Amino acid sequence: MDRIIEKLESGWWIVSHEQKLWLPYGELPHGLAANFDLVGQRALRIGEWQGEPVWLVLQHRRHDMGSVRQVIDQDAGLFQLAGRGVQLAEFYRSHKFCGYCGHPMHPSKTEWAMLCSHCRERYYPQIAPCIIVAIRREDSILLAQHVRHRNGVHTVLAGFVEVGETLEQAVAREVMEESGIKVKNLRYITSQPWPFPQSLMTAFMAEYDSGEIVIDPKELLEANWYRYDDLPLLPPPGTVARRLIEDTVAMCRAEYD
């Protein structure tokens, strides 16, 4: 699936190493390979954007290596491809040797996988499913400040799905563990690939059922009900959390304005 980049090769360039992304001038490189000193490097075509190929190059650059978060405010499709590139680069870096027999592995030519020629084991990129849920109580939404986000941002509750658990069970468990309340009338809304490091966010809306807020201090700094027209600092646009909050606000406005 990979090829040597030629002089006239053009497109979008995802140059990644150790979960970092090369962002000269703060943007994804776009244009001729020669303009970015990429001629002769090996590249994988991982998709297409606006009619042009998107290439992944497994390489570290001395300068301008940043986080894929820096392109989150670009088009959702381009952010998704950048996230795919970073995750694939990390997958190839972390699967050089077979976890069963210890022998070297090589990339598949037909799919995103690493193959062991010794024991025939096949490895795929790991994806960690997560739930994220907006909880509404009349004209208010439950928002929390997470321990890992000490920047004043308040967001909806989220967490990883555990082994042997349905998405619905994960929502009920995470909400109870983090906030002490029960929810009802759960509705699936959308999903979003989230490459931090390798999650798939499954987004829901739910209604408050019962209980008083009792936070898990290992997860949350605080949590509270906020009226739809008096909200704290929110996650940035482009995140599924922001969409859930905005959709909840729109529903409240339709009923209470």
Curated annotation (Swiss-Prot):
<dbReference type="GO" id="GO:0000210">
    <property type="term" value="F:NAD+ diphosphatase activity"/>
</dbReference>
<keyword id="KW-0862">Zinc</keyword>
<feature type="short sequence motif" description="Nudix box">
    <location>
        <begin position="159"/>
        <end position="180"/>
    </location>
</feature>
<comment type="function">
    <text>mRNA decapping enzyme that specifically removes the nicotinamide adenine dinucleotide (NAD) cap from a subset of mRNAs by hydrolyzing the diphosphate linkage to produce nicotinamide mononucleotide (NMN) and 5' monophosphate mRNA. The NAD-cap is present at the 5'-end of some mRNAs and stabilizes RNA against 5'-processing. Has preference for mRNAs with a 5'-end purine. Catalyzes the hydrolysis of a broad range of dinucleotide pyrophosphates.</text>
</comment>
<protein>
    <recommendedName>
        <fullName>NAD-capped RNA hydrolase NudC</fullName>
        <ecNumber>3.6.1.-</ecNumber>
        <ecNumber>3.6.1.22</ecNumber>
    </recommendedName>
</protein>
<dbReference type="Pfam" id="PF00293">
    <property type="entry name" value="NUDIX"/>
</dbReference>
<feature type="binding site">
    <location>
        <position position="119"/>
    </location>
    <ligand>
        <name>Zn(2+)</name>
    </ligand>
</feature>
<feature type="binding site">
    <location>
        <position position="174"/>
    </location>
    <ligand>
        <name>a divalent metal cation 3</name>
    </ligand>
</feature>
<dbReference type="InterPro" id="IPR015376">
    <property type="entry name" value="Znr_NADH_PPase"/>
</dbReference>
<feature type="binding site">
    <location>
        <position position="178"/>
    </location>
    <ligand>
        <name>a divalent metal cation 1</name>
    </ligand>
</feature>
<feature type="binding site">
    <location>
        <position position="219"/>
    </location>
    <ligand>
        <name>a divalent metal cation 1</name>
    </ligand>
</feature>
<keyword id="KW-0479">Metal-binding</keyword>
<comment type="subunit">
    <text>Homodimer.</text>
</comment>
<feature type="binding site">
    <location>
        <position position="219"/>
    </location>
    <ligand>
        <name>a divalent metal cation 3</name>
    </ligand>
</feature>
<keyword id="KW-0378">Hydrolase</keyword>
<feature type="binding site">
    <location>
        <position position="98"/>
    </location>
    <ligand>
        <name>Zn(2+)</name>
    </ligand>
</feature>
<dbReference type="GO" id="GO:0035529">
    <property type="term" value="F:NADH pyrophosphatase activity"/>
</dbReference>
<feature type="binding site">
    <location>
        <position position="158"/>
    </location>
    <ligand>
        <name>a divalent metal cation 1</name>
    </ligand>
</feature>
<feature type="domain" description="Nudix hydrolase">
    <location>
        <begin position="125"/>
        <end position="248"/>
    </location>
</feature>
<dbReference type="InterPro" id="IPR022925">
    <property type="entry name" value="RNA_Hydrolase_NudC"/>
</dbReference>
<feature type="binding site">
    <location>
        <position position="178"/>
    </location>
    <ligand>
        <name>a divalent metal cation 3</name>
    </ligand>
</feature>
<keyword id="KW-0464">Manganese</keyword>
<dbReference type="InterPro" id="IPR049734">
    <property type="entry name" value="NudC-like_C"/>
</dbReference>
<dbReference type="GO" id="GO:0110153">
    <property type="term" value="F:RNA NAD-cap (NMN-forming) hydrolase activity"/>
</dbReference>
<feature type="binding site">
    <location>
        <begin position="192"/>
        <end position="199"/>
    </location>
    <ligand>
        <name>substrate</name>
    </ligand>
</feature>
<feature type="binding site">
    <location>
        <position position="69"/>
    </location>
    <ligand>
        <name>substrate</name>
    </ligand>
</feature>
<feature type="binding site">
    <location>
        <position position="111"/>
    </location>
    <ligand>
        <name>substrate</name>
    </ligand>
</feature>
<comment type="similarity">
    <text>Belongs to the Nudix hydrolase family. NudC subfamily.</text>
</comment>
<keyword id="KW-0460">Magnesium</keyword>
<dbReference type="InterPro" id="IPR020084">
    <property type="entry name" value="NUDIX_hydrolase_CS"/>
</dbReference>
<dbReference type="GO" id="GO:0030145">
    <property type="term" value="F:manganese ion binding"/>
</dbReference>
<feature type="binding site">
    <location>
        <position position="124"/>
    </location>
    <ligand>
        <name>substrate</name>
    </ligand>
</feature>
<dbReference type="InterPro" id="IPR015797">
    <property type="entry name" value="NUDIX_hydrolase-like_dom_sf"/>
</dbReference>
<dbReference type="GO" id="GO:0006734">
    <property type="term" value="P:NADH metabolic process"/>
</dbReference>
<dbReference type="InterPro" id="IPR000086">
    <property type="entry name" value="NUDIX_hydrolase_dom"/>
</dbReference>
<feature type="binding site">
    <location>
        <position position="174"/>
    </location>
    <ligand>
        <name>a divalent metal cation 2</name>
    </ligand>
</feature>
<dbReference type="GO" id="GO:0006742">
    <property type="term" value="P:NADP catabolic process"/>
</dbReference>
<dbReference type="Pfam" id="PF09297">
    <property type="entry name" value="Zn_ribbon_NUD"/>
</dbReference>
<feature type="binding site">
    <location>
        <position position="241"/>
    </location>
    <ligand>
        <name>substrate</name>
    </ligand>
</feature>
<dbReference type="GO" id="GO:0019677">
    <property type="term" value="P:NAD catabolic process"/>
</dbReference>
<feature type="binding site">
    <location>
        <position position="101"/>
    </location>
    <ligand>
        <name>Zn(2+)</name>
    </ligand>
</feature>
<dbReference type="GO" id="GO:0000287">
    <property type="term" value="F:magnesium ion binding"/>
</dbReference>
